[in-house]
Amino acid sequence: MLKTAEDIRQLNDRVSYAGRFLDNLRNEVGKVIIGQSYMLDRLLIGLLSSGHILLEGVPGLAKTLTIRSLAQAIHARFSRIQFTPDLLPADVIGTMIYNQQRNEFVVRKGPIFANFVLADEINRAPAKVQSALLEAMAERQITIGDTTYKLEDPFLVLATQNPLEQEGTYALPEAQADRFLMKVVVGYPTRGEEQVIMRQNVQGLAAPVVNPVVSMQEILSARQMTRDIYMDEKVEQYILDIVFATRSPEQFKLDKLKPIISYGSSPRGSINLAVAAKAQAFLNKRGYVVPEDVKSICVDVLRHRIGLTYEAEAENITAINVIEQILERVNTP
């Protein structure tokens, strides 16, 4: 662990220099995507911290286009899996097929073998398919037949779900949702952004080509540097206070939250707050984490890790309301 001010200063200079590629990446993706800078930054946090992202938003908000454009900008392999009720695990991970000419079984790899995997409408697939995908996310390897295959690095799963249509869907269990680094709610574009989008589509303009501007090696180096970013023990304690407040709010003088929360965040909440805060610091081209980094990613990291009671639902209290009250109460270092 870094201890001296000189160590931190040197790391800060290295991160500031190495983080210059982020501007090129944002500009290149911005040639195609109008707005959605918030979603893009969340995808970059996932990329830097090796964490998978759950995206929630209505159709037509450029989720697929943003992810594909980001993959093209770093010369990564992209695949899209449309989840449906009749999908089988083999359709995701692959299977063994019989080759009559060679009189043997050969492996046919599934779409999971890519750097960026878009799992579209993950809540439309049955539990066994969701489990196959989530196991691959956790293990970062796939077993087909008797052979185990390592998945390429970087490997990032971006799963989407539509908040409007619930008919014919299979709710993602809390234990499965907990595996995602973040749950990001994708919002609508602004009025000005939507006007630009409308004009481009009405005029039938050809979409600009996204060129590779960042190498895979730069991404992997940035990941390692993100892990090295300094986090003071006071910030670590701040993260722990936030997470423990979701479990025992009465210890932080938040007694009114006790009947609202059915269960608090698992230890994955603490881990993911720490790694995402480091990635946020890297996005800010800083070699150390400050409390504002934690606050800025807190809602997206914790919103799917907190269970609410029926009383909370009856009063229209959301996980965001709970997190905001905790952030107001917990002392900032």
What are these regions (language model features)?
Residues 42-45, 98-118:
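Conserved alpha-helical scaffold flanking the Walker A/P-loop in AAA+ ATPase domains
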Residues 1-12, 16, 248-333:
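C-terminal engagement/docking regions of AAA+ P-loop ATPases
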Residues 47-84:
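Walker A/P-loop
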Residues 111-138, 152, 167-176, 188-196:
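Conserved AAA+/SF3 P-loop NTPase catalytic/coupling segment centered on the Walker-B
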Residues 14-61, 244:
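Pre-Walker A (pre-P-loop) alpha-helix and adjacent loop at the N terminus of AAA/AAA+ ATPase modules
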Residues 11-19, 32, 183-256, 283-287, ...:
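Conserved C-terminal "switch" segment of AAA+ ATPases
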Residues 106-115, 144-161, 172-182:
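AAA+/SF3 P-loop NTPase mechanochemical coupling elements
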Residues 58, 92, 160:
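P-loop (Walker A) phosphate-binding loop of NTP-binding proteins
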